[in-house]
Amino acid sequence: MTLFSSISSISNPMTNSKSRISSFGSGTSMGSNSIACGGGCGGGSGGILGLGLGLGLNLFGGSRGACGGNSGSSNPGNGPCSGGKCCGGSCCGI
């Protein structure tokens, strides 16, 4: 099990407001449809914001899991979770 800590500040141009989301641990979900899982998920940018860095933190990018790929609308990815499908794993979150 991989543990990590990540803090990201997101600005929403539609509401001109900022929300601060922090995720700690493995398989922890915080915020609206934010998915965080430890290890093996990789990077990629999709939806509004997708962060990987090998930690597999994906914010507002849709359902994604350790099975690989990013299901964000702008980056369909190439794994079983691509295209908005949830793989049913621990990373699928909300």
Swiss-Prot record:
Q: Which residue stretches belong to region Disordered?
A: 1-25
Q: What's the short name of a Pfam family annotated to this entry?
A: Coiled
| BP GO annotations | sorocarp development
Q: Where is the signal peptide?
A: none
UniProt-listed InterPro entries: HssA/B-like_chaperone, HssA/B-related
Family assignment from sequence similarity:
Belongs to the hssA/B family.
Q: What PANTHER family does the annotation carry?
A: HSSA/B-LIKE PROTEIN 1-RELATED-RELATED, HSSA_B-LIKE PROTEIN 1-RELATED
**Protein name (database record):** HssA/B-like protein 51
Which species does this protein come from?
Dictyostelium discoideum (Social amoeba)
